[in-house]
């Protein structure tokens, strides 16, 4: 005769099931390559899945990183940089790089991404300000939301803070260096880097790495 599980075991099983079911994906959200005018219809699935989106008033690139700070796919990052280089040669670029914060990710439904698109739309329609330069948004995605459960996600503060620091010290550093090199091609180019919440920690970590490398380079 089998003994029924105790209430403690039942509670633990229920808790584990609850948490596992609420875990956010560890996979990238944008996996399709660029196609000409792939976001002429923004609601199309092809647009939402693309890691380089060509909207009427701006381009939007997605650079997504693992919790270890590595790019999910280095070729995707190179494709993004190649597209930005091409835009730069056409007449200059204004690149706005945004790193989302804690409890957020690179999903098309994420509030940080939605607000970023709204901001790009407003800037992109100000053609007099851009002066024929192409506006390019770069959305740096990381697993800022490890749990999708309201309330429980607040428990991830210290864990996500640690991940943010590691992401900043990883591939984001190289990405910002590459964007800086593009920016220096013409005086009219502009590069802006913004981080929200723990996204700010990622920016600080990445910039610290860059400044350290440059200081060592001068001394050497």
Stretch-by-stretch model annotation:
Residues 2-14, 19-160, 176-186:
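Flexible, membrane-associating and regulatory peripheral segments of lipid-active enzymes
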Residues 119-123, 211-217:
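Post-Walker A helix-loop "phosphate-sensing" segment adjacent to the P-loop in P-loop NTPases
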Residues 161-169, 216:
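Acidic, His- and aromatic-enriched active-site or binding-groove loops in soluble protein domains
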Residues 171-173:
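P-loop NTPase catalytic core of nucleic-acid-dependent motor ATPases
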Residues 185-195:
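Alpha/beta-hydrolase fold nucleophile elbow
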Residues 192, 217-220:
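Histidine/cysteine- and/or acidic
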Residues 194-195, 199, 203:
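Gly/Ala-rich beta-loop-alpha elbow adjacent to hydrolase catalytic centers
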Residues 205-209:
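Active-site signature of alpha/beta-hydrolase-fold catalytic machinery across serine-
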